[in-house]
């Protein structure tokens, strides 16, 4: 799961990245890499859920909140050093993996889901990055995505899906709804694809390096019956439990959304009409995907090509 599979060709990566417009300008990049001030740091500390299990460093958010008068200046300097360098030290980026059972009758590894317990300092730095990144993504992620962004609720996605199903049933339309559950979606994400996307979207070199260091310098240790295994490194994937992961996953999933929208705009994929000038093509909520298809053989072929391409790029199944 942690090893990188054979990568898609550079041409395939570039072809997919070109579906995105460049949406980060010079002013946006200045804001992304501006100095971290005490007020921003306090806001980040206050945004964390309390009583979380600590990572390998043993520190908790409550520790820094309670002792901010004493430690605040030093903590701010650590975050600022990371920002100015555009890098996070590997020593900050060690992570415990705890296996959480999906049911009371878990008997095999497939019955467990991994949760990452990151170092507290890492969580603080990555949350600073995530808050700044979210301000840009909120206005750019397509309306078909309903996860991780303020103002987008799952009940809205459910309502749209019901409308599509209702149209198929009551208007005697030919069509199909394809439900896709992305297997181990976070674990299979390609780092190469993330780097290409960030570059193409116009993010600055320093900000990209800052993000990629969060992803690529990580080392893992698995907790088994409370005992930690030796640390090892990964070559792909995003951590469930890292503040950055939901937003980076949004970007990865946005590639699939844009590919379907491009096919629609080019007249190669129509989806299902729910009104004279309104059609539904797809909905995404985290790792759950609904695709609405007319059932036409040509459209089915287009959809197959899109899914095969993204299977190569992110190694989704």
Each model region followed by its residue ranges:
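Catalytic palm active-site di-aspartate
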Residues: 55, 94-97, 113, 145-147, ...
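Short helix-interrupting loop/turn segments at helix-coil junctions
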Residues: 2-12, 51-54, 73, 85-91, ...
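Conserved polymerase palm-domain catalytic core
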Residues: 182-286, 294-301
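Residues that mediate protein self-association or partner binding, especially
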Residues: 1-5, 45, 53, 68, ...
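Surface-exposed loop/turn segments and immediately adjacent short secondary-structure elements
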Residues: 1-110, 120, 124
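Inter-domain linker/hinge segments that demarcate the starts of reverse transcriptase
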Residues: 30-46, 72-83, 97, 128-133, ...
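Conserved catalytic palm subdomain of right-hand nucleotidyl-transferase polymerases, strongest
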Residues: 52-59, 108-117, 156-199
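Conserved pre-motif C helix in the palm subdomain of viral-like polymerases
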Residues: 110-141, 159, 235-266, 311
């Amino acid at each position: 799961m942690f090893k990188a599979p054979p990568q898609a060709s550079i041409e395939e990566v570039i072809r997919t990245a070109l579906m995105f417009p460049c949406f980060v300008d010079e002013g946006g990049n200045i804001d992304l890499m501006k100095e971290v001030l005490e007020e921003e740091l306090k806001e980040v500390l206050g945004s964390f859920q309390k009583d979380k299990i600590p990572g390998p460093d043993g520190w908790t958010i409550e520790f820094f909140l309670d002792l901010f008068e004493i430690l605040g200046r030093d903590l701010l300097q650590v975050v600022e050093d990371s920002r100015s360098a555009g890098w996070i030290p590997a020593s900050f980026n060690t992570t415990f993996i705890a296996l959480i059972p999906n049911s009371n009758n878990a008997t095999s590894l497939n019955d467990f889901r991994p949760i990452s317990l990151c170092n507290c300092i890492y969580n603080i730095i990555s949350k600073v990055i995530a808050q700044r990144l979210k301000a840009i993504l909120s206005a750019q992620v397509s309306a078909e995505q309903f996860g991780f962004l303020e103002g987008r609720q799952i009940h809205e996605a459910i309502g749209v899906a019901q409308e599509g199903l209702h149209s198929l049933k009551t208007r005697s339309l030919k069509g199909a709804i394809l439900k896709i559950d992305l297997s181990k979606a976070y674990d299979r994400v390609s780092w190469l694809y993330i780097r290409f996307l960030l570059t193409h979207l116009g993010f600055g070199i320093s900000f990209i390096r800052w993000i990629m260091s969060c992803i690529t310098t990580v080392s893992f240790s698995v907790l088994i019956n409370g005992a930690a295994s030796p640390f090892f490194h990964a070559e792909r994937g995003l951590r469930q439990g890292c503040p950055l992961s939901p937003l980076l996953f949004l970007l990865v999933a946005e590639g699939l959304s844009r590919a379907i929208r491009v096919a629609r705009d080019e007249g190669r994929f129509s989806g299902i009409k729910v009104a004279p000038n309104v059609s539904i093509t797809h909905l995404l909520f985290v790792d759950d995907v609904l695709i609405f298809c007319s059932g036409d053989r040509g459209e089915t072929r287009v959809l197959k090509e899109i899914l095969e391409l993204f299977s190569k790029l992110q190694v989704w199944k």
